[in-house]
């Protein structure tokens, strides 16, 4: 979104290109890990047809990722269309989680997978907020519908976060980690930036798109750290 919002040939566009290249590098590393993990799982276990269909759909989407990136680089695809295709790919992964939950008969395992699913939704909504907010700030156009969309994404994140909290017993280590996630420096900084953004046009003009992007990215990385802790706990439950 930031890339599309920047004027080609400007310093902002060059910075957006560098940021995009770094994002892609990180994404490629995660895709490689995903392929290794899913191939290992499929070699050792069988899945019901709905899960297998989800795996195949995501594989096809990842196979088409390079062509989508080329279309973005050449600006031959509209920003909205590219966002839709990226979102569809990501949600293919997120929506697989309920399919897995459906087959679980262990109450504790089900709760933790539900918590992971809720945090995956938080991370997805946070990613959208990152892109839309940075693009809006970069554009300099105070747009109320876009602001309402950002506010809605913030509300959805809070709802899913509360769902994740509800999956853990009071005092549990993972519940405490989740609660701390609400009070990180990145979370506090983002909340301040949200309030500034929503205050008035002058508030929006006081923000920098790069700072919004960095702050939201730091918060997402913190969320992903908590998700990783849940995965490790899930692995322990499955092994025992």
Task: Walk through the language-model features, giving the residues of each.
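Hydrophobic alpha-helical segments
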Residues: 1-240
């Amino acid at each position: 979104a930031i890339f599309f919002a920047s004027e080609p040939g400007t310093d902002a566009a060059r910075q957006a290109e560098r940021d995009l290249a770094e994002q892609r590098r990180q994404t490629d590393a995660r895709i490689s890990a995903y392929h290794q993990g899913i191939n290992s799982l499929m070699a050792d276990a069988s899945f019901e047809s709905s899960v297998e269909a989800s795996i195949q759909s995501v594989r096809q989407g990842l196979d088409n990722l390079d062509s989508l990136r080329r279309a973005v680089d050449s600006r031959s695809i509209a920003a909205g269309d590219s966002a839709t295709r990226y979102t569809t790919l990501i949600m293919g992964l997120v929506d697989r989680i309920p399919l897995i939950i459906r087959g679980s008969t262990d109450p504790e395992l089900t709760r933790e997978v539900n918590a992971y699913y809720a945090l995956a939704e938080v991370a997805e909504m946070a990613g959208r907020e990152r892109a839309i907010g940075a693009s809006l700030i970069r554009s300099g156009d105070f747009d109320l519908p876009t602001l309402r969309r950002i506010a809605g994404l913030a509300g959805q994140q809070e709802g899913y976060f509360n769902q994740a909290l509800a999956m853990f017993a009071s005092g549990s280590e993972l519940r405490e980690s989740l609660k701390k996630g609400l009070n990180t420096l990145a979370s506090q900084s983002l909340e301040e930036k949200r309030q500034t953004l929503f205050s008035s046009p002058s508030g929006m003009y006081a923000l920098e798109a790069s700072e919004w992007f960095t702050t939201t990215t730091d918060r997402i990385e913190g969320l992903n750290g908590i998700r990783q802790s849940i995965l490790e706990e899930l692995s322990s439950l499955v092994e025992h």
